Amino acid sequence: MATQAVPATAKKRIRKVFGNIHEVVQMPNLIEVQRESYEQFLRSRPADGYVSGLEKTLRSVFPIRDFAGTAELDFVQYELEDPKYDTDECRQRGMTYAAPMRVTLRLIVFEVDPDTETRSVLDIKEQDVYMGDMPLMTENGTFLINGTERVIVSQMHRSPGVLFDHDRGKTHASGKYLFAARVIPYRGSWLDFEFDAKDIVNVRIDRKRKLPVTSLLRALGDAVIEVNPDKGKFEAGDIVAISGVNRACRVKAVAGRLVTVEDPTGAIIPGGLIQTAEGEKIGHVARIRLQGMSGEDILNYFYRTQRFVRGENGWKVPFVAENWRGQKPAFDVVNADTGEVVFPAGTKISPRAANKAGKDGLETLLIPTDQIFGRYSAYDLIDESTGRIYIEAGDEVTPENLEALDKAGFDHVDLLDIDHVSTGPWIRNTLKADKVEDRDHALSEIYRVMRPGEPPTKETAEALFAGLFFDSERYDLSAVGRVKLNMRLELDAEDTVTTLRSEDILAVVKTLVDLKDGKGEIDDIDNLGNRRVRSVGELLENQYRVGLLRMERAVKERMSSVDVSTAMPNDLINAKPAVAAVREFFGSSQLSQFMDQTNPLSEVTHKRRVSALGPGGLTRERAGFEVRDVHPTHYGRICPIETPEGPNIGLINSLASFSRVNKYGFIETPYRKIVDGKVTNEVVYLSAMEEAKHTIAQANAELDSEGRFVEDLISAREAGEFLMAPRDHVTLMDVSPKQLVSVAASLIPFLENDDANRALMGSNMQRQAVPLVRAEAPFVGTGMEETVARDSGAAIAAKRSGIVDQVDATRIVVRATGAVDAGKSGVDIYTLMKFQRSNQSTCINQRPLVKVGDVVNAGDIIADGPSTEFGELALGRNVLVAFMPWNGYNYEDSILISERIVKDDVFTSIHIDEFEVMARDTKLGPEDITRDIPNVGEEALRNLDEAGIVYIGAEVEPGDILCGKITPKGESPMTPEEKLLRAIFGEKASDVRDTSLRLPPGVSGTVVDVRVFNRHGIDKDERAMAIEREEIDRLTKDREDERAILNRANYARLKEMLLGQIATAAPKGIKKGSEINEELLAEVEKREWWKFAVQDDARQADLEAVKAQYDDAVGLIVKKFEDRVEKLQRGDELPPGVLKMVKVFVAVKRKLQPGDKMAGRHGNKGVISRILPQEDMPFLEDGTPVDIVLNPLGVPSRMNVGQIFETHLGWAARGLGKQVTSALEAWREANPDAQAATPPAAVVDRLKEVYGKEYHADIEGRSTDQIVEMAGLLKNGVPMATPVFDGAREADVAEMLRRAGLDESGQVELFDGRTGDQFDRKVTVGYIYMLKLHHLVDDKIHARSIGPYSLVTQQPLGGKAQFGGQRFGEMEVWALQAYGAAYTLQEMLTVKSDDVVGRTKVYEAIVKGDDTFEAGIPESFNVLVKEMRSLGLNVELSSIEDQSDDDDGLAEAAE
């Protein structure tokens, strides 16, 4: 059958995928979180109306006004210029990759009229001010700070908003629940409401002393403003803006000129302007009275009232059916209208009876008088004429005050509807317990709590309270907080209202009281709807705001001390605080981390990490189990598997593979919509809050051809619970089975068969795998390998479609074929990184995958990086494993390996160490980098050039000199004679000492790169010049190649346009008017072609356009080249006092050796115990020795059975690969001339058989060459993919083994390599993907003879980095004491440690060949004596002989 031809760059190797579930949505880019967040911080998009975080921050601080109000500094716009150095230059020079930021500021100077206090503008000045550099993010989502790559980890913190909770009965002895509510702002004071043990509702501000909540409520309330109307009329419900109040207020009531405005907390100024929301003036404030809530207001907000009317023999009350349901009255309930008994005393009223009575027309009941005693009055009942108060709002009705009411002629009372069952008297009790009378009293109480010890005045108390929650400068809920508040309290405020309002506070208290009454649910703090993520942009925005506020204070002071009329914005601004804040954030914040660059996966994971630690977050010590635990809302948002072991477990998490962070900072995960029972391909992203009301089916639910569920009951999730739901209840469906795990966990095949703890170790250890010299993708993968390689930036993808023009090991040149934008080059040059050092000293090396002439499409992988093969992640190698014990060398997870692995460099890796030396300017003179080093023989200098720097390619050993350096020595003052001799005979060699850079112990390798940096204005040495020339040659080659490709493309286009045209102007020697043809053009040099002009005007215009474009492009290429060269020749910016710096890079080849740590992907880790000769290893029937022997006991107890499945499937993959190879070999033998041969039908059939029918079309579409190449790559094994939770089942594995012609048990007969005997039992053998981890024995092994000592204690330092010794600790001392080894113990504690004199003597004795020594006084004794003296205790050491002499002396003196 004819199929579409497969393009040349199509995958050379196909992975056979076992998954059945078709994914409808593409996985978002893995580092999108970082890039998106920083982009939103850095750049505004005026077209979309989006304001960047940076601009918001600047606008929140500006305008800055001086104290007198005579000047104002306003922000206009900001601009980020092009960065000074590109990323590669920053990496080499140790610079920060940042863009200079220019801010346009406007200084407005006012003249203030002293009488009317009106301001008029005197002068306006605008100026661009440089405000430091803003670090830029690289394409891969990292920052280059001082030349090192860093990642800003996102932080998970509590979302602003309101949270309701209780103490779980822990506070009070009775175990009753004490409910609490907390309003958390983004910044500002925290507001806590809580019940105490006496059921009084209290409030705390910023965790200070508690107050009754009614004090806070009395401080709230409305302003009654007397208005001088200008025009227009006020109506209730209007939104108005009042001068001095920094947000809109709602009009509550209007009575003539008195307007009640809701909650305008803030300083309303008499005479202030009142405007409509549209900005139209309405009137001025004449007088103002702020009135707090009265006791009546408070009670009527929280309780319903019931009116009781005096009747004969009792009180009449309206009948409300729901109040009587389930009641058992102790009296006859009588119908007030007819007098008949409706509910007899002592009978329980059923809901049905209550409803029936209502339907039968019962309206009013009569109840006995004693039934209203103990209820509470809703209002103050007062005698209007005398002012006598009979009963206050909230007071209890008693026989006495009821009698007084009777006498005063009250025929009805309004009582609060508190039944002590569904409505409790909590607020009423709080009101009665509260000693505060009115608003002023309440404000002064709040002031006393917030500022204890200061006497409050009315103004200060008012200002403090207004600033706490109602001033947008000091209190900010943020849009998120407002959205959360609206959702929880069912309010409808705009999300721009980011301060609190009275109704917010009232709604919080109302909800809290309802919780106490048993209505509603408390919140779950660990729900992801209540936790949000702060990514880079937001973290930096907060930090920058802090810097700007510091700057604002300085600017205000400067404005009042400088003559503003002559000053420019530049004179007022000092950007240091803002710049320092940014530098501090990137340099030393807990969330700015040194990027884990061990391999591509560790980079991606680091960028997707979410930490609960850091500033404003949790601390390890305080975090309990609940915070660390997996929560149902983590599903699809945060990986339940990948988290560190140890103290950070559960606090540092990884985003799940499909999740993304929305604009409010909540993590969302995608679902497919279900419409009318049919699963659609429409995908919605939902946060944890939005998901709560849905029932969600799993991704593996069975669907029919129309997309409907096959089963009636479906496994689904609803409100965090797993249940079997009827299919018509299901509203959403997961998009993919791997959406609940992170990237690292989704790379583990057969994850579903592993225990969770081991899966955790597996995902963590993949991040520690060292890139090997030869990468090999796994036989058994999961299909995620390509995504990780692409998104991590390790493998290079083509930016534009085009044709490969040139390829060598260091660069790929692609000629773009699509339409080229103006101002852009038509050539893409991809420079490959060759043997560069990563942050973890692993080696970054990229290799091209394309050939000259290949057609590439945008997005195709054109070069492999570290740990990638054919654009797929390749962290380790496939090795042949046998699970069997072998002479105890597998004890405790040890690993026995074959010598072949070492010999063939299977697990060899390259590590690059960087050493640097600086020549400084010292007090005694400058240091010098030179070959002329005192007291060093020629042998030690053999690797140095004339400048004293090691050659590239030199093999170096520990102690070898990498760079010669001499430092001037201090010396005693010289006598005049010495000075004279010095002047005559010149400098002595003895006045300098050797401070050369030498290779430290334990490192030996090859010098791969040397970089020399010189301070500006210092002469460059020969080596620096050579490096510079080399770099300029490389740039010249790039320039010439780019120009050549440009010329080729343009001249071809030009030729096409000129042919067949009539020339109206022509180069020298060509007649005008002649027709332009091939021969004519051949006579003229190409660069002369531009001189042709043609008759056709339209064509002439096109020619001119092409010429202009060509000139621009050439100009761009030349300018780029000149810029680069200028930067190279300019001196380097070095730290102060440094004249010259040399960096030497040494590559070390690390072969596998005993003590290295290895691991599989299932948490099966171990240390190499022995390397066995190949011939001694157990071997298969065909004589193949196995590569690795693992302990079978490592599987059952650890429950990571995935490794066994992997072994079997890997074994089958190898078998199938052999079958394809044998078919290919047979074809090659039959067809020696591959060009003229018939297509390899047998190979194609075999491939179809191996891959299955889904791949037939792809295989048939390939050309003979492609088939041969593809089959050749399957020699080692057929790559397979078993996606997590949707991979190969046991039956599939057995089927693959059968197809490969192997035993379905996966076990084979094995023979002992030493004797040749067969082992008693069959052994499980197969291919496992093993990784070599970064814990290499070479980095850990360490020995010391003599070395550095601590300054105070004089004991040897500790640790490999300090070249320290091994600590002989307390328990080791006990061991020597137990053995009675007194002399050994003595030397351990003295001459081998801190006996300074003794150890010198021992050294001398050893040199002389003497073997006796004497121990002296350890330095630690002297330290102890000094410490005691510092406490005022004079301790002296004297020997016994001295003591006896002194005694005699004393005796004599006494006589």
Swiss-Prot record:
Class in the EC hierarchy, top level: transferase
Origin: domain of life: Bacteria
Protein keywords: DNA-directed RNA polymerase, Nucleotidyltransferase, Transcription, Transferase
Entry GO CC: DNA-directed RNA polymerase complex
GO MF annotation terms: DNA binding; DNA-directed RNA polymerase activity; ribonucleoside binding
EC assignment: 2.7.7.6
Pfam families: RNA_pol_Rpb2_1, RNA_pol_Rpb2_2, RNA_pol_Rpb2_3, RNA_pol_Rpb2_45, RNA_pol_Rpb2_6, RNA_pol_Rpb2_7
A GO biological process held by the record: DNA-templated transcription
InterPro entries for the chain: DNA-dir_RNA_pol_bsu_ext_1_sf, DNA-dir_RNA_pol_bsu_external_1, DNA-dir_RNA_pol_su2, DNA-dir_RNAP_su2_dom, DNA-dir_RNAP_su2_hyb_sf, RNA_pol_bsu_bac, RNA_pol_bsu_CS, RNA_pol_bsu_protrusion
Nucleus found in the keyword field: no
Residue intervals passing through the bilayer: none
Catalytic activity as recorded in UniProt: RNA(n) + a ribonucleoside 5'-triphosphate = RNA(n+1) + diphosphate
Subunit structure: The RNAP catalytic core consists of 2 alpha, 1 beta, 1 beta' and 1 omega subunit. When a sigma factor is associated with the core the holoenzyme is formed, which can initiate transcription.
Known role: DNA-dependent RNA polymerase catalyzes the transcription of DNA into RNA using the four ribonucleoside triphosphates as substrates.
Family: Belongs to the RNA polymerase beta chain family.
Protein name per its UniProtKB record: DNA-directed RNA polymerase subunit beta
